[in-house]
Amino acid sequence: MSGDAHVRFRERLGVRFPRATRLVVGFEREDDARRFLDAMRARLEEFELTLHPAKTRLIEFGRHAAAQRKQRGLGKPETFAFMGFTFICGKSRQGRFQLQRKTRSDRMRTKLREIKEELRRRMHWPIPAQGRWLRQVVTGHFAYFAVPTNGRALNAFRFYLTDLWRRTLRRRSQRNCLTWDRITQITDDWLPKARILHPWPKLRFAVKHPR
């Protein structure tokens, strides 16, 4: 972005912005980013709105961030969280820059705690009933988080959920009857395998906006 920063709201249309509105904006030049941020703050103040001080920041991120920071004797580029993902400046297997996304660890922990509590309430349900419910949970999780570069987090989610299910079943029956081999067989019968479901962003963009 160059020139003056223009931050406009559609106030004439009566659009309301919730307090939790989130926005990520990318710039090639730091001075453009700072000018935009100042303009954004000023514009929001006109409507008695503010940016969250702990969640608003400028970071060096992108294709050249790692090399530029290395030249200055700094560490790896910072990451940022957005819409349930942590965004990372990574590298592909060919050593090229790759924007990577992985499930936020705190979001995964929260989700697993919720599943643990619900499994306790459903402890005495038949295994098929538990399996059908857990299949819906895993399918919904994968439908959102199964993006490229997030395969490891998907496998981790399925593994920890399997362990929670194993612990729940062991609490209601003889412990020695439910080995890892047995619970693995049960989960393979009921839970989908972790796999990437969404295309790379550039492929999705090409479909929506063909040249």
Please tell me what each predicted stretch does.
Residues 1-211:
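Non-catalytic terminal/accessory segments
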